[in-house]
Amino acid sequence: MNLVNPSILVACILSFCLGAIGCLAFSPFDIWLIAYLSAAGLIWAATLVERKTAMLATFAWSIGYFGVGVQWVNVSMTQFGGVPVIVSYLAVLLLASYLGLYNLLFSYLARRFGLISPFVLASLFTFTEYLRGVVFTGFPWLQFGYTQIDSPFAQLAPIFGVEGLTFLVILLSSYLVDIVKNPTRKIATFTKIAVIIGFSLASNLLQFVQIDQQKPPVKVALIQANIEQQLKWDPAHFENTLRTYQQLINSSLAENEVIILPESAIPALESKINPLLNQLQKMAAAKNTEIIIGTLYENEQQQLFNSALVLGNQTKPYQLHQSLRYNKHHLVPFGEYVPFGSLLDWMREVFILPVNLAKGPFIQPALFTNKGKFNMAICYEVIFGHQLQQNQLAQQADYLITITNDAWFGDSIGPWQHLQMARMRALELGKPLLRAANTGITAVVGFDGKVIKKLPQFETNTLTAEIATTKGHTLFGQFGHWLIYSLSFICVAFGLFRRQKHKKH
């Protein structure tokens, strides 16, 4: 097989397959080495000699990668949105095609400016991945860096974040492709790979944070009520949902200092369950316990928020419009709001979409408890590392916390990928993370990104743990993405300079 200048058909089939296997590098499969093979497929496709072949192969790789990796989105559409199966898979294909545009841009830039050295390719990919994470509110799902959280290179995350790990995957994969395309240089290329791996492994010698011995561990209880999505908003099932939460809370009050409930735990407007929340406030305060709960909050201007607040504080008791709360900032397009206003509002009727939610500020105060400060991310937000990093920089919180309802995605791989991204936030910022999920996966994650304890999915239960906070700051926590973006800018600038110099000669 001619891998240097293959036919369009061979290039597209091979690229599609190499893209599709990339899913195995992510949770729940966690075969992290496959990321390098899959990424090599992208680099190979994007830098093929013939422009048409390169673009079609890059697109085929993207369809395989995203089509398989995010196929779980069809679960919410078919099971809970009333969308026909064929339409749901067409939607997945459309999403994969859209995400593939960023890889096409990557291929175009690399070929247009002749920037095909490994460091420059990794830098260009950092740029196109940045665009994928911000354009139309962003969808930075399936970034290669997440696959490395259990690899020997994971400690690059506290320095450069998940983007730094993605940079490494693309860099090493580019050198692998170079070996295939230029076998006469393989000794020199293997030497470069060894040096890069050596420097990357050296990150394990750095320690940015350590357990704070001055602060006692907090006894936490994470509640997983396991309310089926079909029943969650069914009025006939409301009392049963209420009983489930009351039983789980009552059994946790005496032994724990902080109890955490999932996103929009009680399926009603906060104003409608005000008596219940006041009751929980009194019960928790009497036991010297505090409850962090997700609610659906309507403010005095009749704006609706996906919200979270603290109950049980003895000095600042719960009040509907006065209590300190966190309002979700990064909303899910077509899930919590319809983008482009009235232009796409017709989709609300076709796909049975929920009402439009308002979004909270980008930077918000931490949720305060007597046992520490909590940096909150609700559901989808936890995939946006920049948001948590900026809030952590402003808040100096003791713990990260994320509450979610992944029941929308059933027993697909989606919730596992979601947990993997939450783990990366803990590793990047060097803070323990607490994750309460309606149907799972509820988990306690250490500051090193390792799962300390977790509950099985679809089990009604409470996860308890004693978790200590840390002292110190990671470089990523201090500088965010600027370190990897600066490195990428320097690499691209140097690549352009060398190309210009080459032209003159």
Swiss-Prot record:
Q: Where is the active site?
A: E263, K328, C379
User: Which residue windows are transmembrane per the record?
Assistant: 6-26, 29-49, 53-73, 80-100, 119-139, 152-172, 189-209, 475-495
Q: What topology does the record note for this protein and the membrane?
A: Multi-pass membrane protein
Q: State whether keyword 4Fe-4S applies.
A: no
Looking up Pfam families in the UniProt record yields: CN_hydrolase (PF00795), LNT_N (PF20154)
Q: Which family does it belong to?
A: Belongs to the CN hydrolase family. Apolipoprotein N-acyltransferase subfamily.
The name of this protein is: Apolipoprotein N-acyltransferase
Q: List the taxonomic lineage.
A: Bacteria, Pseudomonadati, Pseudomonadota, Gammaproteobacteria, Pasteurellales
